[in-house]
Every structure is written in structure tokens, then in C-alpha cells.
């Protein structure tokens, strides 16, 4: 079923799942619920990652495909992750688990960007996605 979703739809799914996960995590759920939240993390990561790959495949010229993926990895796994971890750690130290709610902000920004992408992007054909 993922093959039927556009890059923007996958990014929207990932952003929505991330907002839900951070919001629920901030409520200090019981241990058993954290397992379900980690599954939601897997869904939000996978949807976002696949959404980017499909977006790049459709939007980035072939000769820059590796560069596009490298920039995404450097930003998402490096700079942005380091900043998010530092900010989250600061709020966690002061607010406990409620500090995780601050992570809703970057997730919401990503969701807003994905919705904007959905509104301005052309729809790739099924052949272009596969």
C-alpha cells in the first residue's frame, strides 16, 4: 500500500505520526505503552525516509541523486538530530517527560512543509515512483 502514496503523503504520514508519538510520550505513559510508541516511531521514520527518497527520485536530477541523499542524511541524521537532542535534553532536564512535548514543534514544522509540498507538487506517475 505504500507504493500508492505520493512522496508528500508519506511525509504527511510521518509528520502526523511523529506529532502523535511526541505528544503521547510527553504524558509519561506506562512502560507497556512505550513499546507501542516505539512502533509508531518506526512508522514515522519509515514514512518520512521513504517520502524523501521518492521526492528526491522525482525532483532531483539523476546526476545529483547521491548528493541529495547525502545532504538529507547529513542534515536529518547529523545537524538537525544534534540540535533536537540538545533542545530536548534541556527541556527534559527541567520538565521531566513533559519536556518531550517541545519535540512537537519540529514535527509540526515538518508536517506543515509536507502539506505545502503536497499542494505545490505534481503527482508522479506510478511508473515514476516504482
Predicted segment positions?
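Helix-to-loop junctions at the C-terminal end of transmembrane segments
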Residues: 1-7, 92
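Structural signature of the two symmetry-related core transmembrane helices
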Residues: 9-24, 104
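MFS-fold secondary transporters
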Residues: 21-25, 41, 114
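Helix-loop junctions at membrane interfaces in 12-TM secondary transporters
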Residues: 26-37
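Intracellular juxtamembrane helix-capping segments at the cytosolic ends
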Residues: 47-61
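A late C-terminal transmembrane helix in Major Facilitator Superfamily
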Residues: 66-95
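Symmetry-related core transmembrane helices of the 12-TM Major Facilitator Superfamily/SLC fold
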Residues: 99-118
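Intrinsic disorder in cytosolic terminal tails and internal cytosolic loops
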Residues: 117-130
